[in-house]
Amino acid sequence: MKKRMLGLLLTAALVLGVTGCGNTTEKKTTEQANGSSEELTTEAGETQNVRLGVWTGGIDHYLAVVGTEQGIFQKHGIDLETTEFASGINTIDAIVTGQLDIGMIADFAGVNRIGNTQDNFDSKIIGRYVTATGWALYVNEDEVKDLSDLAGKGFGTIPGTITDYYVALTYEKAGIAADEQKLVNIDSTQAMLGVVDSGEVVAGWSSGASAKKLEEHGMKKFLTMDDLGISVDAYYVASKDILAEHEDLVEDFLAAIKETEEWIIANPDEAAGIVEDKTGIPKDQAAANIEATTLLLDFKQDSVDHLDAIKEWAVGAGMFEKDYDIKDYVDTTALGKLFPDAVEN
């Protein structure tokens, strides 16, 4: 498993031509033996507008600004219109209300949203674009020297988020029974720091800048995602309408994402500089996030298994009542046409 975390969808407005789908872009693709998108180019000069929602500061945000700056989206016939959101799940809401064409969603949030809106989740996952293992368990070393020491001690979590899942897996690994589990619900990094300083909490999962703040308050890294055999994955999602009426545009978008990922992998320092220039995120932070991330573009059985494992836990935890088949909310037709090896055959 490797590192990081996730953008997704298109609406009926596109079918009506509101976003410019009337300007058809002719596209020819040449599949390279190694699966590279280097030769995937747009031959016609016209572009089509795509309204993309990104998670501010997320890897999908990086992909959008770097791909635009390098002219990659333009090359593939896309005039990318990017809107930032506080979380990936907000991009899904914006797609539903017709504000966006494509957005993103991370694994846990996606499983939960689908589970709670099964009949109304009018969208499809079109590909995984990143996987990461950057989260870690931070503990007060004076209180926790072994996982079993977590019994009866405060464990911070943000209810309804991925941290609930990580906490559950931690307790399972430690063999701590339910009556010895002491969850402390928080709603922000600042709140977490407060309960850490007061001693109410001795452990919590965190990543990135939030993890650094915990370290500044004396917490130490104790357990990694690799130790639990888990990762954070994120996916692009598109509306059923765009997939049905403008699959070629979805192909263009995915081709541009693939080429952008390859460029970032080959030029991580320059990519971090672009991110800083276009978003204000410090270059060293952007570089660290890129280094901690595995960029890819696929959706295979391992993605299904990953989402199913989260879904099984969520159903057991009562996060939603009705089970579902994740494959009913996936459409890899466009991805498979571009990169056959990226999907399950």
What are these regions (language model features)?
Residues 29-177, 183-187, 202-208, 221-224, ...:
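Short, glycine-/small- and polar/acidic-enriched structural segments
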Residues 75, 117, 227, 296-303, ...:
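Short, solvent-exposed loop/beta-turn-alpha elements that line the ligand-binding surface or hinge
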Residues 65, 70-71, 93, 97, ...:
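Solvent-exposed, polar/charged alpha-helical surfaces in well-ordered, non-transmembrane soluble domains
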Residues 107, 179, 183-184, 188-277:
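Pocket-lining segment of extracytoplasmic ligand-binding domains
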